[in-house]
Amino acid sequence: MLNKPEVLIEAITAREILDSRGRPTIEAEVLLETGAFGIAQVPSGASTGSFEAHELRDDDPARYAGKGVLTAVRNVKEKIAPQLLGTNAFDQASIDQKMIDRDGSSNKKELGANAILGVSLATAKAASAELDIPLYRYLGGPLANVLPVPMMNVLNGGSHADNNVDFQEFMIMPVGADSFTEGLRWGAEVFATLSKVLKERKLLSGVGDEGGYAPNLASNQEALDLLIEAIERSNYKPGEQIALAMDVASSEFYKDGQYVYDGSAHSPQEFIDYLAKLVSEYPIISIEDGLQEEDWDNWKLHTQSLGSRIQLVGDDLFVTNPTRLQRGIDLGVANSILIKLNQIGTLTETLETIALATRCQYTSVISHRSGETEDTTIADLAVATRAGQIKTGSLCRSERVAKYNRLLRIEEELGDRALYAPKVGLGPKF
């Protein structure tokens, strides 16, 4: 991050707002002595890993069915603010460490990761506002000029939809485009065509949490077939111009050592073989959470099976946690990590995790959550870190499109300096 002479934090506050699912979340605001300020809104997940930092809820059944966050809001005002007032806003690492120390727990359960993250991000935004530079430039410096390839979740299943599809996300990736702007257009065109395909088959339904269609389908393979048809009918070439990706979210259908999908239970080896078969039959270049989050031995077999052919992303497996990521690196498990700010709870720890992945030649995918807001921080983070990939849902629902629109503005702002990740060898290596 860029540095500047000391500018002190003058005020910190927070409030309870609503996310895209109508559930409460935190909005934090940090004001500097110069009048510059930053506001950040914290997302929330539906399919959550067991090892994520703790999201503090009120558990008061009389308000929002227990989902309120007034306790976390009070923690910002009464515990975090007194600790940070008068602190240099440009010392992000020190600010984040002070909050971690004040919390004192291993998973931020005392103050709440949602409370801590809101202040962490709002501080960075205030600092970038003080310098009058965009957040991606503040975090990434002069090398922050690579636009990510979007992983567009156009068909939803699992915990993200009320349907019978086991796998959670079926995504398209415009890897053959010349720019982010062009890639986004390709994705929007395929999404529109997919709507027509589903309507013709009398499968058109509402959308899931992340804006993708959520029809009832006969199998997970039918979802892939629908994507191929939509791509081809949009006059694009599957695999060459637009590739496929999946978030299997297998922890959600792992029961008693078996993987239960398409109506029956399967052994881990059968499931590994099934995923390999799908990769052989479809232009899939990325699979997320192919095995259950604690099934380390079979994750290793899964990596041996597909790790040299496609990107294998750990989400529930790694939960943006450097300790779990290091274990995966040591064991030879996966080759990519999903990055979700609220899984670890501070900006500094997020950046450290991305740096560890990069050093060890793991790719990073910057990601939203199923419960989102209009906050566009992850768009700036993707450019700042040159991650090369972003997951922020479908081409539907304004909390998803807000991130895409932010990336369009960044690409325009960068002008001739803007690079599209697949064109410079960043993002998936396959």
UniProtKB/Swiss-Prot annotation:
Where Mg(2+) binds, per the record, is at D247, E288, D315
Q: Which GO terms describe its molecular function?
A: magnesium ion binding; phosphopyruvate hydratase activity
Q: What class of enzyme is it?
A: lyase
Query: Per the UniProt entry, what are the Gene Ontology biological process annotations, in alphabetical order?
Result: glycolytic process
- Annotated residues that bind (2R)-2-phosphoglycerate are located at Q168, K340, R369, S370, K391
The listed locations are: Cytoplasm; Secreted; Cell surface
Active-site residue numbers: E210 (proton donor), K340 (proton acceptor)
Cross-referenced Pfam families, in alphabetical order? Enolase_C (PF00113), Enolase_N (PF03952)
Q: Which InterPro entries match?
A: Enolase (IPR000941), Enolase-like_C_sf (IPR036849), Enolase-like_N (IPR029017), Enolase_C (IPR020810), Enolase_CS (IPR020809), Enolase_N (IPR020811)
**Catalyses which reaction(s):** (2R)-2-phosphoglycerate = phosphoenolpyruvate + H2O
Q: Give any Gene Ontology cellular component.
A: cell surface
Q: Which cofactor does it need?
A: Mg(2+)
Alphabetical UniProt keywords: Cytoplasm, Glycolysis, Lyase, Magnesium, Metal-binding, Secreted
Q: In which pathway does it act?
A: Carbohydrate degradation; glycolysis; pyruvate from D-glyceraldehyde 3-phosphate: step 4/5
Details of cofactor binding: Binds a second Mg(2+) ion via substrate during catalysis.
CDD domains annotated for this entry? Answer: enolase
Q: Which Enzyme Commission number(s) are listed?
A: 4.2.1.11
Parts of the chain that traverse the membrane: none
The entry's family comment says: Belongs to the enolase family.
Q: What does this protein do?
A: Catalyzes the reversible conversion of 2-phosphoglycerate (2-PG) into phosphoenolpyruvate (PEP). It is essential for the degradation of carbohydrates via glycolysis.
Q: What is this protein called?
A: Enolase
Q: Which organism is it from?
A: Rippkaea orientalis (strain PCC 8801 / RF-1)
